[in-house]
């Protein structure tokens, strides 16, 4: 059987999340990935077999019933108009938890294609309150699978309107035999309409188990960041390589960019309820490389991103 060989690769269309639409599932000896072509061609699962770990084991932030108690205890009210009980207040294990109640409009995955509005900030993206132009995380992408030397390419493409200008985003994801790495070739094309300035950023989520562990650190070309834990947030400029060293799962993750980018990093944290009270809970680390570009009529801009995973 092909599974007796080292270099087998299976590609199938399968309704992996039971939402009525097929996803693309690619499996190799080193791992598997799931691409949701109906929601922006994003990756929703990325298994790295050497670590027995799904790097995308995260979730979208959603309202929970008990969040009302947190808001009420902060405002001095109690939902129904009465005062918040001492019990409700004392159950918050951290101060100002109400400031961390943010909710997501899309699933947190990988290769989520954003076109940002001019007033976008790291904080607004972190809170999911930024202006999303073109709706790329929500639209269906076309998909096709191509055989190439030493592997396969999944070709994905979507179109959207940026202030009246039609723009296409194509991303070709190359998976090679015998390698856990992915090479993503992006092309942003001006299809029709006026010339346009575009602020493009693909989102990567990495579920790293523990946001505050000293065994899980961000690094760039110059070594570990000064604030390197997974709950840190910040902006790094002129980046061509960025990574996460995670000794909890003995894995080194790297992202390299053919065009220098500005890179945002921040954690996805939910406010959860446990027996001991309300508290923030780390879910994943978000990395968003982004570029500002100008497209004339018929113009095109491209970047190559390589995602590497290595045992350490």
Model segments located where?
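Beta-strand-rich recognition/accessory modules
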Residues: 3-20, 29, 58, 128-185, ...
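Short polybasic amphipathic segments
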Residues: 24, 42-48, 242-244
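Hydrophobic beta-strand positions
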Residues: 25-26, 188
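Acidic-aromatic substrate-binding/catalytic surfaces of carbohydrate-active enzymes
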Residues: 29-144
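Acidic (Asp/Glu-rich), glycine- and aromatic
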Residues: 38-64, 69-71, 165-169, 177-221, ...
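Active-site/ligand-binding surface loops and adjacent short beta/alpha elements
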Residues: 194-199, 204-265
């Amino acid at each position: 059987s092909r599974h007796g060989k080292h270099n087998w690769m299976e590609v199938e269309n399968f309704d992996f999340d039971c939402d009525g639409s097929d996803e693309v599932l690619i499996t190799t000896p080193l791992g598997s990935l799931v691409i949701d072509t109906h929601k922006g061609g994003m990756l929703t699962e990325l298994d790295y077999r050497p670590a027995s770990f799904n790097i995308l084991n995260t979730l979208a932030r959603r309202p929970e019933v008990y969040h009302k108690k947190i808001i009420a205890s902060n405002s001095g009210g109690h939902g129904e108009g009465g005062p918040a009980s001492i019990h409700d207040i004392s159950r918050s294990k951290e101060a100002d938890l109400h400031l961390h109640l943010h909710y997501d409009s899309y699933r947190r995955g990988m290769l989520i294609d954003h076109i940002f509005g001019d007033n976008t900030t790291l904080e607004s993206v972190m809170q999911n309150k930024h202006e999303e132009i073109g709706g790329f995380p929500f639209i269906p992408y076309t998909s096709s699978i191509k055989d190439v030397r030493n592997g396969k390419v999944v070709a994905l493409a979507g179109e959207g309107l940026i202030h009246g200008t039609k723009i296409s985003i194509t991303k070709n994801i190359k998976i090679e035999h015998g390698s856990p790495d992915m090479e993503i070739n992006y092309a942003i094309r001006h299809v029709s309409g006026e010339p346009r300035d575009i602020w493009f950023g693909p989102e990567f989520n990495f579920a790293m188990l523990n946001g505050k562990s000293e065994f899980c650190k961000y690094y760039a070309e110059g070594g570990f960041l000064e604030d390197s834990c997974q709950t840190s947030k910040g902006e790094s400029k002129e980046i061509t390589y960025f990574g996460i060293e995670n000794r909890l799962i003995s894995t080194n993750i790297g992202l390299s960019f053919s065009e220098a980018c500005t890179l945002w990093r921040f954690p996805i944290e939910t406010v959860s309820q446990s027996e001991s009270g309300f508290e923030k809970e780390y879910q994943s680390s978000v990395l968003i490389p982004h570029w500002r570009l100008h497209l004339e009529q018929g113009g095109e801009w491209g970047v190559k991103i390589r995602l590497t995973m290595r045992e350490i």
